[in-house]
Amino acid sequence: MIQVLLVTICLAVFPYQGSSIILESGNVNDYEVVYPRKVPALPKGAVQPKYEDAMQYEFKVNGEPVVLHLEKNKGLFSEDYSETHYSPDGREITTNPPVEDHCYYHGRIQNDADSTASISACNGLKGHFTLQGETYLIEPLKLPDSEAHAVFKYENVEKEDEAPKMCGVTQNWESYEPIKKASQSNLTPEQQRYLNAKKYVKLVMVADYIMYLKYDRNLTTVRTRMYDIVNVINVIYQRMNIHVALVGLEIWSNKDKFILRSAADVTLKLFATWRETDLLKRKSHDNAQLLTGINFNGPTAGLGYLGGICNPMYSAGIVQDHNKIHHLVAIAMAHEMGHNLGIDHDKDTCTCGAKSCVMAGTLSCEASYLFSDCSRKEHQAFLIKDMPQCILKKPLKTDVVSPPVCGNYFVEVGEDCDCGSPATCRDSCCDAATCKLRQGAQCAEGLCCDQCRFKGAGTECRAATDECDMADLCTGRSAECTDRFQRNGQPCQNNNGYCYNGKCPIMTDQCIALFGPNAAVSEDACFQFNLEGNHYGYCRKEQNTKIACEPQNVKCGRLYCIDSSPANKNPCNIYYSPGDEDKGMVLPGTKCADGKACSNGQCVDVNRAS
């Protein structure tokens, strides 16, 4: 295992406090000058690692000493991370640059539980940290032969444009009210397991041609800007139990892939279409964000599709590079990703313990890295209703770019367990110093692990949840509780359906999930709309073209429901969302006739359904 090297660096405050200076972040009115010094100094001739796995910095802020703890942002880049740019003649150039020894860190201030930090140590220290609710920035002073840095509050940066920037999302495209009103106790075991699971967003960032020109046609400068931004986004989403990993970066260095418009909604649609028809075919990812140098109409700084995550067309957002300070642009991008993850704008009653929250409709001068109570509830409601699967895909152990580090709570190649540092570990089965099982221990975690030993073969580790499920049993040879379920095709729900992959999908339940408790399945005549081959009715898509159902397959296309609420007189309701046109289709495995179930838009023999 790699031994984590802790380096203490003192930042001695220079006995001068500046009144005004022009920095990368802009014109700063009030700042402190500090000089990083390593303590203790390395012995003469010792080899200095380029970027340590963990570091500490001591310095003073407003005359008070603070200690900044930093850890390298492991998993910031995926193993298959790639970068694409274009030659002057339009030739695509894709590389897989080595990013193992990167220089991007997360951290916190000692004795401040609510503090955060996002720092680049590539050329000096650049980034932000929060201290007692205030946001501070640090960046190197560009002085010859000097290690001087400036530390200053964001509020001391002169604002170039006093007009507030806003997100362009102006309305709800979906309603999660039926879910919001449900209590946690009403969740199915499947929904509860989904909520508890850690989520991963595999992100591709794209910089347009205007960005390339804005940063002097310098690929390295644009790349560094994007790295700084994603490092902040990663910090923001940690508190939501979501890990954001950069899997790809694309820079349009010869021309834009489409004509960008100042109308943000038009540009978003064009970008989303390009992503689906081009980018997804050559780079697997969950979400794409465009960073553009164009000025959108009015105060709009960005736009994203609400609830579009995992959708080939709608898992996308666009953000204007509207501020020199990268972490403000990062907050805007995190905001648009929040929309993709099902979160709408905060209302006046929403709180996060700060002056502003990530999902505020207007980008505040008070930078915030916190999601509000409303955002958390909306995100949970979205997850319960849609259960998007792409964000459950955990990176393989070999996908972690950096060598394994014992003590980071992530079980990597060569580790049996990882319970944190020796000071924080509370796991009696795991040796925190080596991340190996203690002598005599067979396991450290898992539903079939009890007091460091495998539970006996045949021990029930998870009860059956319904008639299509089976009680899961331990094998006596593993800590894992393997999921088992009844064979596909077994009748269920009083012969109204057939078991399919452990569930009993029937149309009535699907209508209730979409329209509420008063919903029921429409008359057969409504399903004839599936013969038309448009968004009102179809059975499948081929190259984004809706294919009409054959007459025998009409019960395997769009689901038609009747809502018996007094205000609803339509006997043929469909659920349509511009963020996901396929939502509201009859689910695979649903009974479509006696002895038959839906499979790929066809009504087939129940034993052939897959």
Curated annotation (Swiss-Prot):
| Domain Disintegrin, chain residue ranges per copy | 403-488
> What PANTHER family does UniProt report for this protein, alphabetically?
ADAM A DISINTEGRIN AND METALLOPROTEASE DOMAIN (PTHR11905), DISINTEGRIN AND METALLOPROTEINASE DOMAIN-CONTAINING PROTEIN 28 (PTHR11905:SF32)
Assembly and partners are described as: Monomer.
Q: Where found in the cell?
A: Secreted
Short sequence motif D/ECD-tripeptide: positions: 467-469
The note on cofactor binding and number reads: Binds 1 zinc ion per subunit.
Protein task: Strongly inhibits the collagen-induced human platelet aggregation (inhibition of alpha-2/beta-1 (ITGA2/ITGB1) integrin). Hydrolyzes the Aalpha-chain of fibrinogen, without cleavage of Bbeta- and gamma-chains. Degrades type IV collagen (but not types I, II and V), fibronectin and vitronectin and also integrins alpha-1/beta-1 (ITGA1/ITGB1) and alpha-5/beta/1 (ITGA5/ITGB1) (but not alpha-V/beta-3 (ITGAV/ITGB3) and alpha-V/beta-5 (ITGAV/ITGB5) integrins).
Propeptide position ranges: 21-182
Question: Which GO terms are recorded in the biological process aspect for this UniProt protein?
Answer: apoptotic process; proteolysis
Q: Which Pfam families match?
A: ADAM_CR, Disintegrin, Pep_M12B_propep, Reprolysin
Q: List the disulfide bonds.
A: 310-390, 350-374, 352-357, 406-435, 417-430, 419-425, 429-452, 443-449, 448-474, 461-481, 468-499, 492-504, 511-561, 526-572, 539-549, 556-598, 592-603
Any one GO molecular-function label of the UniProt entry: metal ion binding
Instruction: State if Disulfide bond is listed as a keyword.
Output: yes
Tissue specificity of this protein: Expressed by the venom gland.
Task: Quote the cellular component terms of the Gene Ontology held in the record.
Answer: extracellular region; plasma membrane
Where does this chain mainly localize? secreted
Q: Which UniProt keywords apply?
A: Apoptosis, Calcium, Disulfide bond, Glycoprotein, Hemorrhagic toxin, Hemostasis impairing toxin, Hydrolase, Metal-binding, Metalloprotease, Platelet aggregation inhibiting toxin, Protease, Secreted, Signal, Toxin, Zinc, Zymogen
In its UniProt entry, what is this protein called? Zinc metalloproteinase-disintegrin-like halysase
The answer to whether keyword Transport applies is: no
What family name appears in the similarity comment?
Belongs to the venom metalloproteinase (M12B) family. P-III subfamily. P-IIIa sub-subfamily.
Instruction: Tell me its EC number(s), please.
Output: 3.4.24.-
